[in-house]
């Protein structure tokens, strides 16, 4: 930081405002001293106007007599120069001066205790004790260090290091607060402290993420758990762990290891405990940093000084006091002659800067000498700690070489983008201080302003890459420079940070390494001040929290009077938290009335009531008039209080009366609603225990649902048995109809069934016989029945299987519909169920639990009236029941004869029989409809009783549902009106009974005749008149009843007629609907039969066409086989001797592999013809593409990815875009997604590195080996040939035809799944194809089949020379067998295959006319056929008819 390397002062010189006595005494005791040339004249040193400074014992021998010299005598002027060894005379060594030294020590010790800053007092008050002049000796060698005891005294003023200039800084130790963590034991905490200290070392308070990861990985937990543990433990989100956080991490690891679950969030007590201890650690670090001297921070790292604690300074005038002039001198240079009596400029009033240590321990000086001769060497300004003086020093004497060249290169220039910069011309070996000089700062600021054209105040990372890259340094060095300069990882540099970066680059160019950590000299003032501000805020918060905690404000804020008003100040300390008055500390003084708010008793238990201010004045001091006046005032107050109480009582009475009226009104409304509920038609459906009924229904529904799988499995078993029986019946009938086909294939399966292996063996046997006959010239009679039998069996099995699948699908649909219906019913029941809240409310308001007595009595009264009303309604219904029984047998029941639920839920379209009997329905459809209707009605009734809405009928339209609901509402309304009329009549009857008048119940129930007035009230005085009136009323009543009876009969007759008419209409509609359904079913049956017939015709036509084409293909192939057989006849004869035609071993299977021509292709098996519906279309052959190399995915840790260092991103991009070896273009791996939050979790990086996807291998483009073989029902129940060596059709086919070309596409057969296997068009080599499984062969076993067709059905080109198997040639029609290696000319090519992509079927030997074969051999051309391509593209599908 300081540019003057020769200004070495003692360690104690770092203490501002303190004289350097400790170091000087130490120097006198343990360092060689220079000799004093002579005494000094009196000097005004700022300590009063003392006439002369007497000689003092300073640990050095006495001074010589004054000797006039021509040079200025050495003065202590605050500036230390290099020592002059041969100046003046040396004093002789002095062994000991105990008496003087003792007095000097005592005086100094007293003055240090009293005035630590004023150092001139002890010397001014020292006695004038001087040694005799004769004690001075001639010059002698430098004095040796003597053990005078002063070294210990000097050391007492220092913290460590004694007087040695090379003393190191005090060793820091990890200060862990002596606080007990509650979530771990004391033994565990001690272990964790030991482990923490051993891991972080001395001088550190936090553990880095890397060390923490290494320690936590020893637990052998998975990465996810460790990542979660880190997230919980790192409470400060700093990427480092304090000790409490480390202990918490170990505690969480122990939890995980013991099998417990890690919490999602920390408990509050643990979190607060850890945070408090972390704050204590941080505050202790902040306090140490605040107490440490600024000079102790700004030191050269090579020689760390002893950090001293500064003492408070009274004023600037006391910074520099009188200096000791009798000390050993330092040669200040050859200055001009100066009298020794001249005053020296020691009264400098500016703040004294801290001085760097001097390794030799020589005497220190404080201020520069202001003599007239001037100074020999320039003095550098020392940093004073003021923000304006941030680490800036003067330019060293050697200057700043090459700084101009660096500035010129860094300036913005034209065409700089195309230039390549190196360090040539910028490197040097100059001595560069750590601190930034003033000249450097000026240049760097101008450079910053030149680049910051928009005056944004910062330079972004992209600009920094361009600017700093012009220095020519390596990118790793520039990356480290950026990391040091960009404080806080902001991604940009301000002016000071840019100066730091340029200074580091300039030092690097001069041979200095880039440091790992930014030294204190280069910390910008903005960063330092910001950190200090944060520390200040933390200290203030800590002090306030401590104050509140100690004062108990957190527990009783109103009791302690602690203010919550914000009073923080950054300029001065507050007077105290408790000295302010504001609203936050208001507290009602309960002691004024002598009561506590909590206990309601006198303060101080039995202590008397404290005197109030009013009682302080004694009553004796008041006169009688004053007392009367006070009495009158109190009387007025009491009257006012009484008046106020009366007023409040009246208001309360009014409110009580109003509340009573409202309560009575509510009671009346509740009673009315309860009466409506009791008299409602659906009141009888309310069950006392609906929950029990609901549970019973749920159990019944569950039992019915559990029976569904059993029924479905029984149906499936029956369907399977029916299918097996039908297939066996067809096999027997087919064997009876075609006897010759019965012995063609001998079944070896269970029960003699023909398995897949039997068919393959039979086909291989027939093929071998045909080839042998072709080679030997013999004829083998093969009947067409042998070839058609498997085809018929396969067709029948497909038909039976299709019907079985349809039936199974129907069963599944029934199961699904039943489950959905059951689920809907269960959901409706759950919606009507009561939870705990509703159950509590029900018990409260229905059972009267937890309510007031008045409300409970009212509830009980309602329940009693409800029960009475229900009993009366039941009695009334029971009384009317016999009178309506005859009408129920005669006519359909009216709305009153059936239950309300039935009349409400019945549909108008459903026919209703007289009496509801089941026998009235004649047809099964009507009976089924009646049963369904009755079931729906019962279900609706039970659901309505539970309060559940009935589900919508599946076959009911919206209009029908609306009509039904409208009818139900009308019926309900009509019934409610009747009930209201009846209830009103009953009420009038009760009123009449209570008043003693006759009950006019009948008159209230029916409409009264117009003009008739009610009879007058009875009179007790005239009994005869009353009797007469009663007789008249009885006669009128009888007449009225007769009229009403007639009207009722007329209405019932009309109603009966309407119902009969509606019934007839419904019957007619039902008949018409049944006839329409029958006609629709007949038409559907006709359409289905027509479709089946058409499909059968198409199938037969296609089969005939396929057979004809196969015949032609076999005919064309025979010619090629005859030509090939002539050359291999001898070889085949030898092999035929070892063949046993009847044997079914693997020898028969291996024969064709040796004799089959390489260019022949297998015929399509019957399984590909008949079982086309069972085959899944094979995937089309992909277009040939070059093999792609796996993409290289570059993964990085989150810390690297999230760093805003532009050079790091540049290096990462360079690593990603490094050219790989020449390879086909591969898809570029997507960059990792940006993460918004910087994660400092080291385990997060570990898990990301572990989760990086490994590059997959190259994708194979080869055709699958099986190529669809064995896919047509190899898992059939009848196939039990698992113990054969072939293990399936695919293996046997690969043995037989392993060397043949790829198979033809399925489109060549003309079947519905023609696009199942397209031709191989890829240039990639394909494996040898396998023969299709002949489960239901549609063609007879034939000699080697014809060549394959092109995939698109176009006529093929002439056959090229055949490729070797697996060579990857395109699937063109293969030629006849290849020529011999000797070079013999090949035979003529075979005739072109028939167009359309369908092979010609080969006719059986002996089955075709010999003349036709002769004509073909003679060269007769076949008739050109027209292509009718029905297969479409080889890669396209087809729609089945």
Swiss-Prot record:
Residues 1-150, 292-316, 594-622, 824-845, 867-1441 are annotated as: Disordered. GO terms for cellular component: actin cortical patch; endosome membrane; plasma membrane. Residues 1139-1152, 1273-1282 have a biased composition (Acidic residues). It is found in: Cell membrane; Endosome membrane; Cytoplasm, Cytoskeleton, Actin patch. Residues 1177-1189, 1219-1236, 1340-1402 have a biased composition (Pro residues). The keyword Cytoplasm applies. InterPro entries: EF-hand-dom_pair (IPR011992), EF_hand_dom (IPR002048), EH_dom (IPR000261), WH2_dom (IPR003124). This is Actin cytoskeleton-regulatory complex protein PAN1. The gene is PAN1.
């Amino acid at each position: 930081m300081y540019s003057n390397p020769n200004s070495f002062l003692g360690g104690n010189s770092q203490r501002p405002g303190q004289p350097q006595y400790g170091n000087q005494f130490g120097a006198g005791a343990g360092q060689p001293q220079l000799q004093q040339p002579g005494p000094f004249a009196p000097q005004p040193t700022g300590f009063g106007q003392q006439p002369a400074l007497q000689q003092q014992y300073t640990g050095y021998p006495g001074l010589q007599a004054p000797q006039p010299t021509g040079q200025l005598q050495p003065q202590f002027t605050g500036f230390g120069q290099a020592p002059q060894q041969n100046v003046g005379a040396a004093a002789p060594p002095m062994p000991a001066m105990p008496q003087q030294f003792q007095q000097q020590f005592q005086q100094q010790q007293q003055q240090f205790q009293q005035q630590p800053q004023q150092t001139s007092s002890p010397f001014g008050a020292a006695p004038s004790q001087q040694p005799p002049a004769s004690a001075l000796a001639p010059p002698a060698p430098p004095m040796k260090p003597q053990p005078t005891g002063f070294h210990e005294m000097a050391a007492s003023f220092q913290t460590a290091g004694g007087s040695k200039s090379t003393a190191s800084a005090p060793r820091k130790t990890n200060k862990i607060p002596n606080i007990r963590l509650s979530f771990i034991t004391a033994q565990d905490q001690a272990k964790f402290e030991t482990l923490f200290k051993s891991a972080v070392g001395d001088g550190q308070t936090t553990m880095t993420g890397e060390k923490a990861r290494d320690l936590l990985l020893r637990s052998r937990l998975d990465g996810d758990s460790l990542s979660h543990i880190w997230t919980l433990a790192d409470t400060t989100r700093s990427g480092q762990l304090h000790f409490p956080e480390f202990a918490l991490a170990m505690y969480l690891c122990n939890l995980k290891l013991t099998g417990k679950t890690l919490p999602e969030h920390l408990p509050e007590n643990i979190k607060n405990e850890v945070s408090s201890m972390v704050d204590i650690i941080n505050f202790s670090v902040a306090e140490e940093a605040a107490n440490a001297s600024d000079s102790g921070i700004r030191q050269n790292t090579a020689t760390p000084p002893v950090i001293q604690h500064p003492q408070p300074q009274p004023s600037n005038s006391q910074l520099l006091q009188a200096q000791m002039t009798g000390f050993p001198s330092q040669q200040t240079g050859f200055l001009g002659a100066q009298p020794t009596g001249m005053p020296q400029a020691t009264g400098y009033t500016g703040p004294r800067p801290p001085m760097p240590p001097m390794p030799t321990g020589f005497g220190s000086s404080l201020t520069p000498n202001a003599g007239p001769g001037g100074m020999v060497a320039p003095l550098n300004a020392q940093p004073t700690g003021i923000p304006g003086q941030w680490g800036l020093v003067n330019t060293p004497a050697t200057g700043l070489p090459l700084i101009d060249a660096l500035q010129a290169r860094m300036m913005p220039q034209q065409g700089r983008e195309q230039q390549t910069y190196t360090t040539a011309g910028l490197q040097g070996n100059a001595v560069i201080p750590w601190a930034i000089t003033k000249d450097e700062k000026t240049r760097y600021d101008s450079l910053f302003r030149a680049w910051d054209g928009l005056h944004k105040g910062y330079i972004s990372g992209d600009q920094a890459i361009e600017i700093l890259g012009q220095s020519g340094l390596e990118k790793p060095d520039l990356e480290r420079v950026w990391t040091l300069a960009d404080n806080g990882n902001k991604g940009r540099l301000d002016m000071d940070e840019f100066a730091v970066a340029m200074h580091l680059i300039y030092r690097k160019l001069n041979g200095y390494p880039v440091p790992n950590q930014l030294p204190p000299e280069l910390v910008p003032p903005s960063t330092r001040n910001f950190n200090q501000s944060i520390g200040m805020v933390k200290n203030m918060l800590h002090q306030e929290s401590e104050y509140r905690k100690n004062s108990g404000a957190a527990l009783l804020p109103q009791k302690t009077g602690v203010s919550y008003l914000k009073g923080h100040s950054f300029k001065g300390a507050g007077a105290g938290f408790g000295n302010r008055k504001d609203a936050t500390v208001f507290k009602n003084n309960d002691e004024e009335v002598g009561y506590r708010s909590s206990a309601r008793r006198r303060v101080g238990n039995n202590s008397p009531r404290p005197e109030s201010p009013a009682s302080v004045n004694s009553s004796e001091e008041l006169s009688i008039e004053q007392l009367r006046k006070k009495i009158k005032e109190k009387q007025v107050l009491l009257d006012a209080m009484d008046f106020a109480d009366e007023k409040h009582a009246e208001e309360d009475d009014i409110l009580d009366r109003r509340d009573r009226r409202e309560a009575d009104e509510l009671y009346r409304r509740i009673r009315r609603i309860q009466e409506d509920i009791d008299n409602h038609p659906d009141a009888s459906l309310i069950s006392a225990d609906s929950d029990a009924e609901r549970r019973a229904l749920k159990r019944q529904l569950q039992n019915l649902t559990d029976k569904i799988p059993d029924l479905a499995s029984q149906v499936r078993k029956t369907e399977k048995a029916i299918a097996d029986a039908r297939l066996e019946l067809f096999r027997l009938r087919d064997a009876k109809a075609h006897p010759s086909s019965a012995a063609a294939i001998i079944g070896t399966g269970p029960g003699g069934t023909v398995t897949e292996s039997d068919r393959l063996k039979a086909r291989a046997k027939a093929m071998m016989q045909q080839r042998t006959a072709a080679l030997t010239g013999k004829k083998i009679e093969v009947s067409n029945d042998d070839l058609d039998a498997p085809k018929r069996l396969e067709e029948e099995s497909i038909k039976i299987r299709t019907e079985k699948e349809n039936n199974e699908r129907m069963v599944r649909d029934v199961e699904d519909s039943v489950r959905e219906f059951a689920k809907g019913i269960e959901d409706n029941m759950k919606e009507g169920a009561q939870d705990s809240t509703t159950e509590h409310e029900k018990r409260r308001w229905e059972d009267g639990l937890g309510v007031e007595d008045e409300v409970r009595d009212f509830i009980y009264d309602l329940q009693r009236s409800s029960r009475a009303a229900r009993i009366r309604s039941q009695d009334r219904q029971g009384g009317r029941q016999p009178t309506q029984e005859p009408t129920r047998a005669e006519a359909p029941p009216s709305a009153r004869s059936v239950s309300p639920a039935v009349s409400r839920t019945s549909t108008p379209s459903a026919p209703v029989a007289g009496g509801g009997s089941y026998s009235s329905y004649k047809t099964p459809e009507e009976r089924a409809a009646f049963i369904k209707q009755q079931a729906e009605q019962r279900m609706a009734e039970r659901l309505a009783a539970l309060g559940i809405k009935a589900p919508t009928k599946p076959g009911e339209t919206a209009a029908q549902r609306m009509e039904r609901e409208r009818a139900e509402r009308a019926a309900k309304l009509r019934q409610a009106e009747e009930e209201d009329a009846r209830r009103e009549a009953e009420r009038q009857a009760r009123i009449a009974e209570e008043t003693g008048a006759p009950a006019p119940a009948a008159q209230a129930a029916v409409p009264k005749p117009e003009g008739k007035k009610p009879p007058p009230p009875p009179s007790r005085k005239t009994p005869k008149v009353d009797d007469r009136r009663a007789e008249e009323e009885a006669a009128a009543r009888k007449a009225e009843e007769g009229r009403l009876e007639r009207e009722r009969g007329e209405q019932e007759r009309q109603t009966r007629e309407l119902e009969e008419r509606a019934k007839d209409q419904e019957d007619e509609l039902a008949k018409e609907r049944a006839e329409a359904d029958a006609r629709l079913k007949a038409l559907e049956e006709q359409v289905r039969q027509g479709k089946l017939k058409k499909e059968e015709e198409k199938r037969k036509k296609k089969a005939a066409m396929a057979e004809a084409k196969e015949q032609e293909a076999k005919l064309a192939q025979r010619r090629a086989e005859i030509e090939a057989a002539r050359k291999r006849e001898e070889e085949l004869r030898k092999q035929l001797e070892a063949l046993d035609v009847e044997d079914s071993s693997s020898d028969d299977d291996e024969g064709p592999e040796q004799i089959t021509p390489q260019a022949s292709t297998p015929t399509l098996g019957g399984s590909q013809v008949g079982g086309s519906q069972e085959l899944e279309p094979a995937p089309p052959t992909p277009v040939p593409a070059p093999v792609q190399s796996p993409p290289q995915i570059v993964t990085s840790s989150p810390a690297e990815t999230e760093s805003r260092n532009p050079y790091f991103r540049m290096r990462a991009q360079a690593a990603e875009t490094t050219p790989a070896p020449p390879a086909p273009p591969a898809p570029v791996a997507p960059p990792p997604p940006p993460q918004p939050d910087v994660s400092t979790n080291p385990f997060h990086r570990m898990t990301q590195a572990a989760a990086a996807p490994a590059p997959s291998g190259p994708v194979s483009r080869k055709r699958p080996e099986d190529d669809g073989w064995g896919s047509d029902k190899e898992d059939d129940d009848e196939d039990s040939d698992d113990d054969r060596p072939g293990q399936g059709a695919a293996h046997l086919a690969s043995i037989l035809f392993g060397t043949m070309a790829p198979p033809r596409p399925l489109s060549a057969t003309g079947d519905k799944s023609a696009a199942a296997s397209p031709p191989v068009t890829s240039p990639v080599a394909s494996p040898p194809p396998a023969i299709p499984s002949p489960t239901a062969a549609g063609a007879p076993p034939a000699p080697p089949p014809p060549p394959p067709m092109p995939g698109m059905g176009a006529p093929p080109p002439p056959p090229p020379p055949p490729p070797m198997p697996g060579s990857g040639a395109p699937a063109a029609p293969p030629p006849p067998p290849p020529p011999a290696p000797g070079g013999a000319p090949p035979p003529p090519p075979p005739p072109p295959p028939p167009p359309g992509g369908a092979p010609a079927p080969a006719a059986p030997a002996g089955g075709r006319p010999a003349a036709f074969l002769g004509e073909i051999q003679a060269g007769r051309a076949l008739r050109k056929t027209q292509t009718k391509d029905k297969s479409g593209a080889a890669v396209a599908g087809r729609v089945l008819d």
